[in-house]
Design a protein with these regions (language model features):
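Glycine-rich beta-strand-centered segment in the early N-terminal region that forms part
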Residues: 36-53, 63-106
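NAD(P)H dinucleotide-binding glycine-rich loop of Rossmann-like/cofactor-binding domains
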Residues: 98-161
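N-terminal Rossmann NAD(P)H-binding glycine-rich loop of SDR-like oxidoreductase domains
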Residues: 163, 171
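Adenosine-nucleotide cofactor-binding segment
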Residues: 175-187
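Hydrophobic/small residue at the entry helix of a nucleotide-binding pocket
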Residues: 166
Length: 187
């Protein structure tokens, strides 16, 4: 409890606003809360979010289709500035513009702590908004094109839901490889 002013000031510094869920359900289960975030561990960074990505998987976590331990934060991807680093983090510094995807759901927050290995620097010319919304789609596309099946220029690909987020990234990436792409879309 932060009953004294000096304690309140310390607690205020450690507190951040976050959307959390305490039970599964519709949008009505989303709660704005103040949480004590603390400081990053040795291999972690604290990021002040500037933009977050909204994904279907967030609704799956919220509804219980993809169960999470409750109470839980929500959201997997975002972008912002590093405001604190752990003692063993070497390739990132305070002030770096970064994006991330993954970790425990908690992107819907002013700040969050992440393993440094989940964070990438944002290249010059890419906004926080673009970086925040492309991470999960880009990683999914990379997995499909490079891990599931190594696509080459002689391949013909049928991609369902080509107008969706992953479909748009996949289509452009597949085209850059030189393969023939056939895309379907819903009505």
């Amino acid at each position: 409890s932060c009953s004294r002013l000096s304690q309140w000031n310390v607690c205020k510094i450690l507190m951040t606003k976050a959307i959390i869920i305490k039970k599964q359900g519709g949008p009505e289960v989303l709660e704005l809360s103040e949480i004590n975030l603390g400081s990053p561990g040795p291999n972690e960074v604290k990021v002040k979010n500037i933009a977050i990505g909204l994904n279907y998987i967030d609704t799956y976590h919220r509804s219980g289709l993809y169960p999470v331990n409750l109470p839980s934060g929500i959201g997997l991807e975002g972008a912002g500035k590093i405001i604190e680093i752990g003692s063993d983090v070497k390739d990132l510094t305070v002030g770096d513009n970064v994006a991330y995807a993954g970790g425990t759901p908690s992107a819907y927050a002013d700040e969050r702590i992440l393993p440094a290995q989940l964070v990438v620097k944002i290249p010059d010319g890419i906004s926080h908004k673009v970086a925040a919304c492309i991470m999960t789609k880009g990683l999914t596309t990379h997995y499909l094109l490079c891990k599931t099946y190594k696509l080459n220029s002689k391949d013909v690909v049928l991609f369902h839901a080509a107008a969706g987020g992953v479909g748009q990234v996949f289509s452009q990436w597949a085209k850059s490889i030189g393969c023939k792409l056939i895309g379907t879309v819903g009505s």
